[in-house]
Amino acid sequence: MNLSDVPLRPGSAELLPVRGVRALQAFDNRDWVAVEVPVALEFNGIAHAVMLATPTDLADFALGFALSEGILLGRNELYGVEEAYAPEGITLKLDVASAAFARLKARRRSMAGRTGCGLCGTESLAHVTRALPPLPEGPALSTRAVARGMRELASMQVLQKVTGAVHAAAWCSAEGEALLVREDVGRHNALDKLVGALARSSVPASTGFIAVTSRASFEMVQKTVAARVPLLAAVSASTSLATAIAEDAGLTLAGFVRGDDLVIYTHPWRLNGLPANA
């Protein structure tokens, strides 16, 4: 699947005047710049978080954020999302079930984040790494499928190709076909959008894997586990905390996925096609 010929989404980029220099010669030009705006999330009228995000796929973002943060236990706990636009930014007003609102109040957070900040304003260390049930075994996957998924993700990054400023996350089938892709200036936001899109779709999340264009930080691992996806493939490295969480949760974590090369940090048994040790 290749979406490189798809035009830019409305509101995702702006064409701005720039001053360029090439071979020591200055020139005037116009260039596409990714849009970044404050996006506030309200739950039943109570302000909860402000993220800096690309203003596309906002319904997916709202649902995915609430699911990956453990505020919602399922899509059925979200009754609706209203998008309110103002000069200073966008407010996503989520109407959630009373049980979900009670969970939110029990682990009160008030975040004002940098781009995609996943921890800003966390009031307790206990809220940083929350316990999640171990992942199911899931399907047998192959290193070839992981490599294919990362290639397809790269080919489908429409906004990144034009602006060079955004991350992307994709859900890929067991064969490596990238079936859902979301982009955002923040890596956490891109993954939240993907989690929301997965929840809205009929795709069984545990039958494939997630590929991301960033490092595998612990938040990315935690969000993948919360989405019940058994493998996370990242183009860059993992961290010590991300690796520990992946190990405990039964997540296969792969980093430095570039071409046919990759590094497997945890649970390599889930991947077929690994060469024998020399």
From Swiss-Prot:
Q: Which domain of life is it from?
A: Bacteria
Keyword Transport belongs to the record: no
Q: Report the active site residues.
A: C117
GO function terms (MF aspect): sulfur carrier activity; sulfurtransferase activity
Q: Where in the cell is it found?
A: Cytoplasm
GO CC term (a single one) = cytoplasm
Q: Name one Pfam family in it.
A: FdhD-NarQ
Q: Where's it mainly located?
A: cytoplasm
Q: Which Gene3D superfamilies match?
A: 3.10.20.10, Cytidine Deaminase, domain 2 (3.40.140.10)
Q: Which biological process terms from the Gene Ontology are attached to this UniProt entry?
A: Mo-molybdopterin cofactor biosynthetic process
InterPro entries per UniProt: Cytidine_deaminase-like, FdhD
Alphabetical keyword list? Cytoplasm, Molybdenum cofactor biosynthesis
Q: Does the keyword Repressor apply?
A: no
Which HAMAP family does the protein's record reference? FdhD (MF_00187)
Question: Belongs to which family?
Answer: Belongs to the FdhD family.
> Which PANTHER family would you find in this protein's record?
FORMATE DEHYDROGENASE, SULFUR CARRIER PROTEIN FDHD
Main role? Required for formate dehydrogenase (FDH) activity. Acts as a sulfur carrier protein that transfers sulfur from IscS to the molybdenum cofactor prior to its insertion into FDH.
Name of the protein described by the UniProt record: Sulfur carrier protein FdhD
Q: Which gene encodes it?
A: fdhD
